[in-house]
């Protein structure tokens, strides 16, 4: 039954991939395509989004484009994954369909590159940006691109910025001017780092077809197998569903992390604390120098094993014929984890938030996408989905040993209370109860206990950011993804309601969400508000679409005096309404940006000239400099608003 539900949801994935709200979402995607690729691409994409699925003659007729323009543009749009294509087995006709999801990710590309640069370094972000601009690319082609080589030259051994490389690579990328041989040495480890984190995947043929076409094609193949002809009825349907899901997974699987993950962590991935500056002082002083030397030797051996063997000197190149593309599903997981960390930072100490970040990063390495289904289930119908369990001992290895965990929580309970009543207890270093190691760091067992205490703080209401489980007698921690995704949606809606209608409306909404449908009298008793204020708030929120009123007649006469009026709060309907408004607002921002650009088109063309760009003070007059500053401020304002609205779309739809 579960497999049948998964297949049914997969078949309807195509409609969900069209962003649910077709009108404003399609308008937004058309603007994004035209903004990034020009008017020709925008015209073809608008035609496909308006008429949904077209063969080549109809697409040519509706778009009114000649073959010399249409065919090369279609090939380029398929390269950019903006258009699906599928050749029917019945009549041999090829049909084209707009890929709304890929078009929408154009608005999130800057945020993704910023995240990758923060995580893996500037050169990794450059490589990912190149792949993103090409749609997909062959490894051998990436080796020939001058921008990747020039980036290595500019960075002068980019290991200072690149989070995956150490001093050894700085020497190999030195100043001898022979950069042509060093570029592949840097490119291949960077590609391996991106693949190990899941940020790039292998391109498969099924990825050029819509999900619905892949489902129908896989089902046709499964039904045509000889062993299926002997089955009938329910057994046949179950076998078809199981075979279809398996074949679909096999055809669409582009995972490149196999062999690049060691003990649940990407090979060569530096622990968060290892990227700190070498001259940064420790939290606590070291005391026993003999023990310090031994510990330093062990740390050096571990770091060499972690970095050099697994990443820094892994000179095995990637397969030259491998074609890769950006894995947006995995990047959504990483961006969602960043939102969870921001949520945690609002109520816990920085030390606890850093422990939570280590947990989420471990989970991210083993999580391929935010949801198993395309559509978000309705409130109350969504089952809980826990992450993979992460052992507490593994987290103890990732948390910075210099991070002071003991002072950010309450005092530890002692197993044996002090028997000297009325006397001041001895200092910890006098009575022998000091739990620190020789170098001022907590001992292993005590450190693990402190991490467990911090995770226990995160598991407390109201957010319940973590969950504790016992697996084979070992303490593990997980994250309840669907619960936290709902929490993010609710917090976003509550923030909007409070900003529009005030804190009184927020109290009413929280009561309705917790209690369900209530009549006005019962709602007034629970919310402790005067009837006059309550009615004003309910009327304003009903006009804004945030609460609804249901009429329940007591008899068949349906008289107003014999009718019960129940107020209720439907977060699912409100989320859809907010998404529609958000798409519309993003479209208006892009349209306004285009209009403002057209007003000063000649001036902007002048500023984009190669001789003027970077030398504005020399070639532009004082009024032109003022106009340029005003334009940049206006552009930053509009694009910043689009990015902020994209955060809301991610919370409401993707996470």
Curated annotation (Swiss-Prot):
GO terms for cellular component: RNA polymerase III complex. It comes from the Eukaryota. Pfam families: HTH_9, POLR3C_WHD, RNA_pol_Rpc82. Keywords: DNA-directed RNA polymerase, Nucleus, Transcription, Zinc. It is found in: Nucleus. Component of the RNA polymerase III (Pol III) complex consisting of 17 subunits. This is DNA-directed RNA polymerase III subunit rpc3. It comes from Neosartorya fischeri (strain ATCC 1020 / DSM 3700 / CBS 544.65 / FGSC A1164 / JCM 1740 / NRRL 181 / WB 181). The gene is rpc82.
């Amino acid at each position: 039954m579960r497999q049948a539900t998964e297949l049914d949801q997969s078949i309807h994935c195509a409609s969900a991939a069209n962003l649910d709200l077709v009108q404003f979402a399609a308008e937004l995607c058309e603007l994004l395509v035209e903004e990034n690729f020009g008017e020709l691409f925008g015209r073809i994409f608008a035609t496909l989004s308006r008429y949904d699925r077209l063969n080549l003659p109809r697409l040519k007729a509706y778009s009114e484009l000649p073959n010399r323009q249409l065919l090369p543009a279609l090939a380029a749009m398929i390269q950019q994954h903006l258009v699906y294509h599928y050749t029917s087995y019945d009549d041999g006709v090829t049909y084209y369909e707009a890929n709304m999801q890929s078009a929408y990710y154009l608005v999130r590309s800057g945020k993704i590159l910023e995240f990758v640069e923060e995580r893996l370094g500037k050169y990794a972000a450059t490589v990912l940006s190149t792949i993103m601009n090409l749609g997909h690319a062959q490894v051998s082609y990436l080796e020939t691109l001058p921008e990747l080589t020039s980036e290595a030259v500019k960075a002068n051994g980019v290991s200072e910025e690149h989070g995956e490389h150490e001093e050894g690579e700085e020497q190999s990328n030195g100043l001898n001017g022979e950069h042509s041989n060093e570029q592949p040495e840097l490119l291949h480890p960077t590609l391996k780092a991106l693949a190990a984190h899941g940020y790039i995947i292998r391109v498969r043929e099924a990825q050029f077809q819509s999900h619905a076409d892949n489902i129908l094609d896989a089902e046709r193949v499964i039904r045509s197998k000889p062993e299926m002809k002997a089955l009938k009825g329910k057994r046949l349907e179950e076998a078809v569903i199981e075979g279809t899901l398996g074949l679909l997974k096999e055809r669409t699987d582009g995972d490149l992390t196999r062999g690049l993950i060691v003990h649940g962590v990407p090979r060569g991935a530096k622990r968060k604390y290892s990227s700190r500056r070498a001259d940064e002082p420790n939290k606590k002083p070291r005391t026993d120098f003999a023990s310090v030397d031994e510990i330093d030797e062990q740390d050096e051996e571990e770091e060499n094993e972690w970095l050099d063997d697994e990443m820094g000197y892994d000179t095995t190149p990637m397969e030259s014929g491998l074609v890769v593309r950006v894995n947006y599903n995995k990047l959504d997981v990483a961006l969602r984890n960043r939102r969870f960390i921001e949520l945690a930072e609002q109520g816990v100490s920085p030390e606890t938030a850093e422990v939570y970040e280590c947990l989420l990063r471990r989970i991210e390495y083993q999580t391929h996408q935010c949801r198993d289904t395309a559509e978000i289930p309705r409130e109350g119908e969504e089952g809980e989905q826990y992450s993979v369990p992460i052992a507490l001992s593994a987290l103890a290895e990732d948390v910075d040993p210099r991070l002071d965990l003991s002072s950010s929580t309450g005092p530890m309970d002692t197993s044996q209370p002090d028997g000297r009543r009325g006397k001041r207890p001895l200092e910890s270093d006098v009575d022998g109860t000091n739990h620190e190691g020789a170098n001022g760091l907590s001992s292993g067992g005590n450190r693990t206990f402190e991490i467990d205490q911090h995770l226990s703080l995160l598991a407390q209401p109201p957010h319940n950011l973590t969950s504790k489980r016992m697996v084979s007698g070992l303490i593990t921690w997980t994250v309840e993804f669907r619960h936290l995704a709902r929490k993010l949606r609710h917090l976003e809606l509550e923030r909007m309601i409070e900003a529009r209608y005030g804190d009184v409306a927020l109290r009413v909404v929280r009561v309705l969400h917790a209690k369900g449908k209530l009549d006005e009298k019962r709602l007034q008793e629970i919310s402790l508000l005067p009837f006059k204020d309550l009615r004003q708030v309910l009327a304003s929120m009903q006009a804004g679409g945030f609460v609804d009123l249901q009429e329940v007649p007591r008899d068949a006469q349906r008289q107003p005096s014999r009718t019960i009026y129940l107020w209720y709060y439907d977060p699912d309907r409100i989320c859809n309404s907010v998404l529609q408004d958000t798409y519309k607002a993003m479209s208006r921002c892009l349209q306004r940006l285009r209009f403002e650009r057209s007003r000063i088109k000649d001036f902007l063309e002048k500023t984009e000239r190669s001789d003027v760009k970077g030398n504005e003070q020399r070639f532009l007059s004082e009024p032109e400099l003022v106009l340029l500053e005003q334009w940049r401020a206006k552009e930053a304002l509009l694009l910043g608003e689009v990015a902020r609205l994209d955060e809301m779309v991610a919370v409401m739809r993707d996470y």
